[in-house]
Each structure stands twice: as structure tokens, then as C-alpha cells.
Amino acid sequence: MDRPVLVLDGMSLTCGDVAAAARGAVQVELSADGRQRAGAAAEVAAYATARREVYGRTTGVGANRETAVSSGDAARHGLRLVRSHAGGGGPLIAAELSRGMLVVRVNQIAAGGSGVDPGVLDALIDAVNKGLSVPVPAWGAIGTGDLTALAMTALCLLGERDWVPRPARPPHFALASPDALAFISSNAATIGEAALACSDLRELVRAAITVAALSHLAVRASTEPYAEQVHAARPHPGQQEVAAAMRGLLAGPAGPAPRIQDPYGYRALPQVHGPAVDAARHAGQIVTSELNAAAENPLIDVAGQAVWHNGNFHTAYVGLALDALRAALFQTSALSAARLGTLVEPAFTGLAPFLATDPPPSSGIMILEYVAQSAIADIRRLATPAALGSAVLSRGVEEHAGFSTQSARATTDVVPAYRIVLACELVAAVRALRLRGIRPAGRSLADAFELAAGALPAQTSDRPLDGDVVTAQRLLPELAALLPPEPLPAERLPAEPVSPERPATAAGSPP
């Protein structure tokens, strides 16, 4: 079956695009403009290298930056560089993360600031479209460049390391020595991993609203806390968005609320889940900006015919945004568990403890609270900010690190844990609604209930619930899709690529 085509142009890649390409849902192509920008940058890089010192092209790297590459060694220096930097350690990262790295590096080079020979782009795209991955060890980067991951990629292109799985005709490109550092000096692996996590979490934080609405209906909670007037009084965007979504999902006739005030799991949902919505949106915007940035050091400025040595290799923005997202996810996960606690409590449901239907003291869904809290414990652990660390490296000349790589990895690990938390709440909410004989009045929530009730087993006697939790996890993307479109752009802070058409900002090489 033909797959949809994703065109990489260096300007418009989104987190969802990276996820689709990394997971084989689309075929990747390069735009003509992206190829042209990459080629123009390569020409300027060659021109500049012949006339001035350029870090990594005519010099060593790190603490060796003041050491010039001799003319007699120029053809071998780059190969030694990629070989020596392909030294990561630990287990290999997931294949989809490796392919995400390749997609991001193609788009970065197409943005037109690296100076790398554009011929490498075809080989990288070929690898993605064949479903290949680079064997990238998990440890080797600290948020200032994924040197080990990109060096391993370079060795795969050179034929010194095998692609995974090894194809009959491996993608091949002989990187020229001056292009070695320009190719590996990138955060493509970190940014690619962040993009996949942001894509997944954007979907889950939307699904969480639908799940919460089902729980709300099951305990006959009050809709008063979601009133528009309440949230106009404190107009945080995410808070207002969650409240509006709840008003829409719970629309329809409702009887008098049984309590003057509900527990925080319902009453404070907009105030607690809203920050997660905002944090997911902000992280997506930050990562999207990185996806389309020519964040190269040195930066090849085609318009100015200049080379700029700079600090755009540092990804503090990414790490801090992801750290904030994980903290927000812990808060809303705890609120999901609080709602689960009301669903097993007769005072809120009017049903037997733990929604059991066998003779007392049957356990019903008791174990789901333990499962959810186990996952939340991991979310709490993973919410520790990676940005609290730092490092001094390469004989003291690289004296700071933001550890965005570790932040991206922690955010990846949060995804399945948060998914489990929501799945436990969904299983409980659907069972409570069934047992109470309640059907949602609003179209979207009715669709959500019918979808979940049609997939989850109706049997309520004590039995293993692991299969229910797996099924509930699979339903979450469809529950997210039932919400109206987001009122604000999900992930669009475009970075203007370096291009020949951009007005010149530098007359020549900086001193």
C-alpha cells in the first residue's frame, strides 16, 4: 500500500510529522528548495574554508579548537573525528527514535546552515523509507550536541557500521573530511526524541479530558466549576480550554448536583490539567522551532557569505520545556488517581465498594488503584528536572550542559506511565456508568462512551483486568479525536531558515 508523502523542506516540519515518519506511516521526500538551500550552504562553506579558519573544518574540536589541521592531514582528519566520536555506551535506543533522528537531521540540513554536501540527504532519506535505524547507544550526549549518535550515523553511511536491519543495498554516502564535524554537530537525536514524546503527550492530554468527563458523569459531579464566568476571572489559556471542553462534553440536561462542592479531582480539573495542556503546547512549540532551525555551529550564512561561530548547539530551551511538561503531567496524573478513588467509593457512586458485583467482600476493580499509583510513582521520579545537572568537559572549555537529552529520555519514559494512569481511570469510569445505567446526553461524550463500552468487556465479576487496561490504552487516541480542534496552534513557532533569499545580516566573516 502506498504511504502518504511527507516533504521535508527545512521550514515546516512538526512533531507529528516526525512521529509519522519515524513510525513508518509516511514516505519521506526532500523539497527542491531544501536541496537548493543545502547546496548553497555547502558552496559558501567550501569558499570560506579556503580563506579563513573554520572550527572543525580547518581546526580540531573541543579543547583542540586552536590546533590547525595540516594540509597533508586534511583528507583523513574528518574520518578520524567520526570514528573517535562514535563511542556511546549502554543499550541501543529504540529504532523509531533513531529514525526520528535521521528525519530531523535531513530537515536541519535542508534549512541551509550546515554546509554539509547535500548528497548525504538522499542516503538518509533512503534509510528512513527502508525502515532502517542506526545502532545508537543510549548514553553519550548531554544536551550540547548528539555527537556519538551522529558519528555512528556517519559510520553507517561510510559502511563501517551496519544499518539495522542490514539491507541488501545499504544507504551509502562518503562524507568528505571537512563535512565530518558539520554533519555530527547536531542535536537531531534529542530533538527527534522530544518530537515523538510531544506528539504522543499532546494526544494523551486531550484524551484525559474525555476520560475525566466520563468519570464526572459517573459520580454525578457538579458542572458549576466549569462555568465560563469562573475561568474568565482567571484566564489562563489551558485552564479555559479544559473548562470549555468539559462544558461541551457534559452539555445536556442534568439533575441537581448531590454535593455543594466536589473533590478536587473534578472541581479543580481545569486548574490542574490546564497547566499540562499549556505545557504540552509550549513544549511542542519549542521543539517545532528546533525542528526547523539551522542550529549549526559554525553557522554557514549564505546571504552574508559568512561563517558564524556560536552557541546554538545548546538546547536549554528544549530541556526546560520538557522538564516543565513532566512536572505538569505528574500533577494531572495525581488528579486522575483521585478521580479513580471516587469511582471505587460507594458514597460517590451509590454502588458496591470497588464497583464489585460478586458477593462481599469481592475486590472488583480494587487493583486498578495500585496499578495507577505504581505508574504515578514512576512519573514522580521522572519529573525530577534534568536541568538541575551540569558538567565541565574537554579540559574546561565546555563548562556547561543543560542535559536536554536526559530530559527528552525521561519524557519518553513518562508516556507509557501516563497512558496507564488514564487507562485505569477509563476502565473504572465505563464500569461505573454501566452499573449505574447512565448514558451521556451530549453527542461527543456519548460517542466516547459507546466507543469504550463497545471495546471493554461487560463482564463485572472478579477477573483479571490486565486485558481491559491494554484495551483502554488503545482507545485513548480515538477519545482525544472526539474533542474539538485546539483553539491555539499546537506546535508552530517557525524558525526562518538560512537561505540565499534572506536579507544579508553580515557583510563578511566575524572576527
Feature locations, PLM:
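FAD-binding glycine-rich core of flavoenzymes that anchor FAD
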Residues: G113-W139
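Short gly/ser-rich anion-binding loops that grip negatively charged ligand groups
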Residues: T67, G87, P91, A110-S114, ...
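Generic short alpha-helical segment signal, independent of protein family or function
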Residues: E66, V82-G89, L102, V106-I109, ...
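Residues that scaffold, gate, or flank divalent-cation-dependent active/transport sites
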Residues: L13-R57, V61-R99, R105, D117, ...
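FAD-binding core of FAD-dependent oxidoreductases
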Residues: Y55-H77, S84-N107, P135-L158, F173-I191, ...
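C-terminal auxiliary extensions adjacent to catalytic cores
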Residues: M1-Q36, A40-T49, A74, P135, ...
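Short helix-coil transition sites and intra-membrane helix breaks within transmembrane domains
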Residues: G113-S114, L147, S333
